[in-house]
Structure formats: C-alpha cells, structure tokens
Amino acid sequence: MDALMPAPQSADLRRITLANGLSVALCHDSRLKRSAASLRVAAGSHDAPLAWPGLAHFLEHLFFLGTERFQAGENLMTFVQRHGGQVNASTRERTTDFFFELPQTAFAQGLERLCDMLARPRMTVADQLREREVLHAEFIAWRGDANARDQLRLLAAVNPQHPLRGFHAGNRYSLSVPNPAFQQALQNFYQRFYQAAQMTLCLSGPQSLAELETLANTHGALFASGTKVRQHAPAPLMKHPTSLEHIDEQKHLLFACEHLPAKADEAVAFLCHWLNAAQPGGLIATLIERGLIESLNATPLYQFDGQLLLDIELNANRPSASTIKSLLLSWLRFFKTQWPALIEEYQRLEQRRLQMSGALTLAHHHCRELPAQLSDQGADALRELLEQLTSNALIGSAPVDNLDSTLAEWRLPAPNPFLESIAEDSPEAALYLRWELPSAQPTLWQMLNTRLTPLIEDARQAGVNLTFSAYGNYWQIQLNGLRAPMVAVIEHALQRLRHAAPGPLTHAGQASEPLIPVRQLLKHLADHYLISKQAQTTGDLHTVWKHSRWISFASGFCAASQLQLNTALNATPGTRQTDVPTLPAIRLGKRWSSEASSSSENAVLVFCPAPTASVEDEAAWRLLAHLLQAPFYQRLRVELQLGYAVFSGIRQIAGRTGLLFGVQSPTCSADQLFQHIEAFIGRLPALIRTADLPEQIRVLSAQFDPANMPDQQQADIHWQAYLAGHRAHHSQALQRALSNLDTHSLLATANQLIDAAGGWLIVASRPASAAVPLSLPER
C-alpha cells in the first residue's frame, strides 16, 4: 500500500459573500452528473420564542406551500419531484437546512424556486391552519416513535434549564395560528433570522465556478440584507449537584462537555470515527469478544457554542454497565496518548469519502463546513476533549468503581486493506449477485449480515457501497462505487459467506427498534409480494448453500477487471444459474396482506404491478407514476389532510415494475386509507385528459439520459431490466417507448391499472375489514 494517498483534484471550491451579506460556497466537480443546493439558516428550534414551541419547525413547513409566483403545481417540491430529483428540509436545535438535487438542466429553475420560497413566503392564515394539522399528525407519530421516546428519557439527565429539555416539536395546541401575538412572533422570527447575513448557501455540480457564481448572484440577491444575529448561549448541560435522573446504561452512556475550543467539531468527528472502528484490539471488538454488547455507536447528540453531548449507544447483552464504563474509560486513556498515529489514515479516509460524494453530499459538506480533516486547531480541541471525557463527565450514570479492574490490551486499528492509491479519474462499476433459496431464511441472513458488518464499513471507506439484502426467497449482494477495490471486496465477502462461524445463532444480531408503521411496511413489501407460503427455516447454512442457485450482473468493468471478477465469482457458494431469471408470477385481482404494528397509527401500501414486463408497459407505468405523484400528494396530504407520510412512485421488485402508493395516518383506519387511494386511482383518466403529455414525456425521458443519471441509478435500472429479460441499452429503449405514448394509449394503461390487470397488493398495518370489497371496482 502506498504511504500516502493524494487528495483528489477534481473538485474546486470558491467562497464569496454577496452584497446583501449572503455567504456562498461554490463547488465544481467535473465527475458529477447532477447539481445540488444546500442552504443553512443559523436559527433553529432553540431560537424560537418560549411562548410558541415548534414555531421554527412550523415555519420550515410553511415555506413549501408555494408562493405567489410559484403556486402549488409549480413550487419547489413539485418541480423537483417532476424532474426526478430529491428535496427536503430539516429543523435542528440551532440550524434549519433546505436542500435539493436536480439534473443540471433543471438546476437553475430549482434554485430560483428555493430562493423565492424563502424570500417571499405566502404564509396565509388558511395555509397555516392546514399545515398545522400536518404538523400535529407529525407530532403524534413522533410521540409514538420508540426512538423519540428513548431520546426523551436520555435527555432527562440534562439540566432542566437547558433548552434540550424543552418541547420543540409543535402541535395543534402550541401553534395558536389565529392569535395575533402568534402571528407577530412568526413574522418577527422570520424577519430576524431569514435574512442574508444569517444564511449560507452552497451550490455544487459539474458547472464551472463562473456559472455557479452567476446563479448564486442572480438568485441569492433575493434575500433581504441584514446583520449577523448572535444566537443566545444555552444554560450548562450538567446541573450541580448531578441530576438524580438515571439513564438506561444498557442502552446509553452520555458525556457532557463544556467550553470546548474552536474546531471541536473536527475533534469529535475524529474521536467518533475511531471509537466506532470495529477492528480487533479496539473498544467494540473487545466488548463483543467478552460478550458484553452486540453493538456500539458513538455520535454527537448535540453540539453548539462549545457544548457537547456525546452519546455512546449500546446494545448490551446483560447488566454489565460498570464493566463497560471501565473499559470505555480505559480505552479513552489509551487513545489520549496514541491518537497522533492515526491522523494520516484518517486524512486518507476523508479524502476518499469526498472523492466519492455526490452533489448533494458535497453541497452539505461545504455549506455546513463539516470536518474532513484534523487540523492543528482540531488537534488542540481533541486534547481538551479527551481531558474532559472522564467519569466526571458522565451524566445520568452511577459512579464508576474499580477503574483498573477490567483493563484490556488495547491496540490501534490496522490500515484499511482496500484503501489504495487510486487515480483521480478511476471509474465506477457495479456488481449484483443474487441467490435463489428453496425458502426464506431470515435468521441465517441476519447472522451472515452481522458477519459482513466490518467488511461493509471497510468497503465504504474505500469507496465501495456493499449491501447484503434479503427479500422473498432471495439473498442479494450489491456493490456500487470505485471499480479498483471491488474484486478484492467481493472476494472477502464470499469468503465470509462461505465460512460462517459455527455454533448456535444466538448472537446473530439484536432486534432493532420498531419502525414507524409505513417504514415497517416498506421494509417487508417485497416479502409480501414474493412469498406465498410459510418458510421452512433451518440453521444449516451448508444445506442452504447446497440447494441455492445464483446469478450475477456487472457493469462498468473493463476486460481485464472483468476477468478478475469472473475468477473471484468462481468461489460463490451454490450453483450458477444458466437459464434466464424467472419473473414473479402475476396474481390477478386485489389481495390484502397485513404486517402487525403496535403503533396507534395506521399505514397502507398499495403496489400495482404492470401486467407484463415489456418495455412498453414499463414506460407507460413510469409515465403514470410521473403524472400522478404531485396530484396524489396534493389530494391526500394537503386537501384531505390524512397525515404527513404520503408518497407515490415506481417500485421494482425482482424485475417486476409497479406503481406504489403509501399513506400513514393518525386519524384514518387502514380500510379508509385504502379507499382514499382507490378513489384517487379511479380519477386517473380525468388527470390524463388535462395533462400536457408531450411536455411531461419530455421531462421524464430526460431523466433516462445517461448524462443526467448517477452511476448507481443507471446500474439499478439495468439490473432490474436484466431480471425482466431485457438486455443492453434499456434506458434508450425506455426513451423510445415513452416517445410513442399519447393520450389514447395512456388512457388504456390507466384502465389496466384500475382493472388491476397486473394485480394489486395491499399491505397494511391492520387486517382488512369485511366491509372493504376487494373485487374489481366498477368504472
């Protein structure tokens, strides 16, 4: 391995300040295929007036409702979705972020909409009343979320005077929209913080720095001028005498630090990286070897103005908090003297991370000035941080006794074996390897996935995303990223899959926290679609491999690397499948499947596969999804106010293309949610007749232009096309099929959808009521 990996030179960065005071970062990277904007406002939930909890979060929601210039059908969210991009926002304790990513051709129009919605919000009382109900639905879901409850219990150990102990989510009762005092507070907060001097904007993409600067000057000038507002300092994190509130030490250890110096964010990122390293001789490996934990993850729960809450999240096997704390503090003392030896490896890892980052990640990185190295100032901050991280900084914990009773022989992690010096223009590739099993084996999959976890992290650091998934009777390994380390990564993965550790499966991983209902349904959608009978599970991995068949699909490999890959794949367990993959059978009619949930909320997914796997049907189904995405959201979320989780789009499962609709609601039953979705689908013909189809086809077709598609998205489309029996140039075939569609043919497709010609699968958090007819609807 080379001693030092050169920093990638493809990205150029320029920082400027506009005349109105807006701070702008411009990032050009020639390898990018999309462009992104990330805008941060230095104000968050803790800056809102105490009398109106949730005001900052509420305001974030209001911006997305459209402006006088860009109404609901043309606002930022609708525009980005129509062009196949991504858009979101987030309100944190002291910051609020708005961001989107789009193809380069649509980026300027997206930026125009972002700046317009923040500079000229409509904020009518009618809009506020409607959006308050959405926020209230979000609040109900948040209140029932296990992770949210866990965090509330964790923060109970913090000083009651600190804003972290306050209520900031906002709901129907804290947001008194008709009250003139609330309206004045909303306007005051907006005018105080949503001005240029309080904002930072980053634009990233393949455009030249000059082009990006022109865009920033044109649209950033919309913001009102102002002066930087100093956000008020919070109370101390720790109350003296120490709080009597004890946290669950089987799940968390919490450190509170104060008065950390500049660049403490670099120090925290550096420390957390090495705390979370799972290599032998480190903290995690030692705790697992001793049977004390299943997993550990260190992350900053809160950082602002020199304060830090460092959360050590645990999955402990047994009551062993005292031993775990002793070993943690022992490792910190070891790290205090040894960390300088890890700086070079850390710089290499961060360089590789940025080298592989997409447009949106780069925009976030430079907008938020996230750490990517340990500078001299960062090293000074790390020394101070490690001085504070003693037993005295633990809050909500019992005193630590016998600090030296369970010491370990610590050692530094070995360098990443896949992190070799790679040329700046190293190409990307993708590999898909799928096994078909006689029946689903969730327990064995969990054991193997746990075994792959350290490799997944090493591969990620080297620029390769490795996932091991299970759906239906299939197991699948997927690799995306830099081509150079990919063969070595798959060799290591196959070795771990073939030679799993013997013995019982009791340590195959700990059950994860329950998901909100709609996420739970999404997680198991493919299983409900593919599995029609009870699985015959076994603990005999050798037998499972013996009776499995596998296929592979690769893209982006040159002749030499393809030869190396083929040699590596010869070690794949199971039998290579020589015939073409079999598509899941079409099941006519509508069938209801339930996925039990303990939540009081209800959720429903409706998956509607195309009747055939032809390119023509896929193109028509994709155009339907494109047309209905914004109207579906408008109808169910805005007009009917069913809940905050409302979405639709294309979903592909094992080569089958289908429309997917999803809703979660705190007020409607599963039956009612399905009926709302069904009613919307029934109105599709009217929507098609009023649509500007040539323009919609043009916009959708542009999304399949290789110049606009990230490499992983291209690879995913071609993998699904391979499973469906199609071969090369599938994107171009889709574009041709789209160009042949017109109102008449799309109406015929809509009628196929309404008639459930490809079947409908309804997956819900509750069983179907006898009152819900699942026969074909009348048209």
From Swiss-Prot:
Keywords: Hydrolase, Metal-binding, Metalloprotease, PQQ biosynthesis, Protease, Zinc
Co-factor note (free text): Binds 1 zinc ion per subunit.
Function description: Required for coenzyme pyrroloquinoline quinone (PQQ) biosynthesis. It is thought that this protein is a protease that cleaves peptides bond in a small peptide (gene pqqA), providing the glutamate and tyrosine residues which are necessary for the synthesis of PQQ.
Residues given in the record as Zn(2+) binding sites: 57, 61, 138
Enzyme nomenclature, EC number: 3.4.24.-
Cofactors required: Zn(2+)
GO molecular function: metalloendopeptidase activity; zinc ion binding
One Pfam assignment: Peptidase_M16
GO biological process terms, semicolon-separated: proteolysis; pyrroloquinoline quinone biosynthetic process
Family that this chain belongs to: Belongs to the peptidase M16 family.
One GO cellular component term: cytoplasm
Lineage of origin: Bacteria, Pseudomonadati, Pseudomonadota, Gammaproteobacteria, Pseudomonadales
Annotated source species: Pseudomonas syringae pv. tomato (strain ATCC BAA-871 / DC3000)
Keyword tRNA processing: no
Active site: 60
Official protein name in the record: Coenzyme PQQ synthesis protein F
Pathway given in the UniProt record: Cofactor biosynthesis; pyrroloquinoline quinone biosynthesis
